[in-house]
Amino acid sequence: MAKTVVRKNESFDDALRRFKRTVSRSGTLQEYRKREFYEKPSVKKKLKSEAARKRKAKKKRF
């Protein structure tokens, strides 16, 4: 869980910016979006192999 303590004399915008940066670095939103809906194991397997195929093709190009 991302936690941000507002510093003395820090504006709300700066604190919000630091919080957003902390959340994005920790991967909280990505994890939430990944688990938002249930995926059947077969679909997960298909997506995983598709991603591997894309990575392999991209690596082959360069």
UniProtKB/Swiss-Prot annotation:
GO BP: any one term: translation
UniProt KW tRNA processing keyword: no
Gene3D superfamilies (alphabetical): Ribosomal protein S8
Entry GO CC: ribonucleoprotein complex; ribosome
Matching Pfam families: Ribosomal_S21 (PF01165)
Annotated keywords: Ribonucleoprotein, Ribosomal protein
Stretches with biased composition (Basic and acidic residues): 43-52
InterPro entries cross-referenced by the UniProt entry: Ribosomal_bS21, Ribosomal_bS21_CS, Ribosomal_bS21_sf
Feature: compositional bias, Basic residues: 53-62
Region (Disordered), start-end ranges: 43-62
A single GO molecular function term of this UniProt record: structural constituent of ribosome
Signal peptide: none
Domain of life: Bacteria
Ribonucleoprotein as UniProt keyword: yes
NCBIfam families (alphabetical): S21p
Similarity comment: family membership: Belongs to the bacterial ribosomal protein bS21 family.
PANTHER family recorded: MITOCHONDRIAL 28S RIBOSOMAL PROTEIN S21 (PTHR21109), SMALL RIBOSOMAL SUBUNIT PROTEIN BS21 (PTHR21109:SF22)
Protein name (database record): Small ribosomal subunit protein bS21
Source organism (scientific name): Levilactobacillus brevis (strain ATCC 367 / BCRC 12310 / CIP 105137 / JCM 1170 / LMG 11437 / NCIMB 947 / NCTC 947)
